[in-house]
Amino acid sequence: MNVVLSKSALENVSKHKYSGIDDSILAKLILQKYWNFCLKFVPLNIAPYLITLTGTITILLSFFIVGYYSPYLEGTLPRWVYAMSGLTLFFYQTMDNLDGKQARRTGSSSPLGQLFDHGCDSIVCTLQSLIVASVANYGVGYISLIQLFITALLPFWMATWEEYHTGVLHLGPINGPDEGIIIIVCALLSTAIFGNAFWTFKPFVASSQLLPSIIQQWLPTFIQQLMLNEIIVASLSLPCLITCFFNIKNVVQHLQAKQKPILPALKHILVWVIITVSSFIWYYTSTNLLPLSSIWFNNIRTVQFSIGIIFGELVSRLILAHMCHEKYNIIQAPLYPLILSTFCSTINYFNGTIIIPENLLLILFTVTSFVHYSLFVKSTISQLCSYLNIKCFTITKKH
């Protein structure tokens, strides 16, 4: 949907200055030196947005290649595919950090750069989550949903939400964009070397002979049967939730210092809640009514990617609202396709029969999500470029 920015909104955007703090230990010790070294090889006439887009396209290609070999998020892939997925992610991280450096080096920094960069990041978040799900053999199930919504989308939303209210994007000493990506890269490359069998390894079963009988009796059966990939998702969920707690703490302290109401700010978290709850309900109703032919089984990547597109637009709208100094509404148009699809699937479930064909539902959901997001991107970039007197993919000479 086209977004019409008011004159006051555009004026606020033109005055916006990005404020970010990266306390990453790894970045300070190693990565910053590596990125500065790479920057020397980037020609001065290359636009920062082009660097951002190049990294995003690389992840998109990786997503399609992995999807070709693993359409259902499981199975053994060729070793080169694992290696490719790790190297493309590392390349993306490099590009994601070079764009800002290139903008400052060429004097082409602009508010559009922040929106474009973080907007691409929000899409990559879902793409990379699905790539990891295939490599780690998550398959179609709640484990892949938890991995996407809890360990990927939630931290991204909360960090952006904190920035909206405090004006600062603060990354901690150990964070996802730096340490998190390097850990994933190492995991992907390790899979290329050793194969993917270790992801489905059951450590409690393998160590049953070493565990005292009292511990074996105490451990519930479902825990004893946990695979390594499931243990990893559970282990990653906890620090993600802790990080979100500190996001909330920082916002509350900031608002209290400014003597502003807290509840309206907390309501913005409902956007992530709506996306997550709707997706889980849709998955449950669809897979229980159609155990073998559900679109969540046959088209899991398409469904989750479309949800990621919706998430990406909502994140971009939050960033835009922050730059425009405007209020952010909880219920917005990008949510409608997901809410409607969940509603239709729920009707099918409670009627015990297919009233609304799922294939039709999938087509409408996917097309609507992509078209809506595309129009938003086109409209927003066009208006910002026009008002700021810049071009998106070429560096505008300043007079």
Curated annotation (Swiss-Prot):
Classification via Gene3D superfamilies: 1.20.120.1760
Membrane topology: Multi-pass membrane protein
Bilayer-crossing regions: 46-66, 76-95, 139-159, 181-201, 226-246, 262-282, 303-323, 330-350, 352-372
GO CC, one annotated term: membrane
S-S bonds: none
Intracellular or extracellular location(s): Membrane
This protein's name: Uncharacterized CDP-alcohol phosphatidyltransferase class-I family protein 3
Keywords: Membrane, Transferase, Transmembrane, Transmembrane helix
Keyword Cell membrane recorded: no
Gene Ontology terms, MF aspect: phosphotransferase activity, for other substituted phosphate groups
Entry-linked PANTHER family: BB IN A BOXCAR, ISOFORM C (PTHR10414:SF37), ETHANOLAMINEPHOSPHOTRANSFERASE (PTHR10414)
Recorded name of the encoding gene: captC
Family statement drawn from the similarity comment of this UniProt entry: Belongs to the CDP-alcohol phosphatidyltransferase class-I family.
One record GO biological process: phospholipid biosynthetic process
InterPro entries hit by this protein: CDP-OH_P_trans, CDP-OH_PTrfase_TM_dom, CDP_ALCOHOL_P_TRANSF_CS, CHOPT
One Pfam entry name: CDP-OH_P_transf
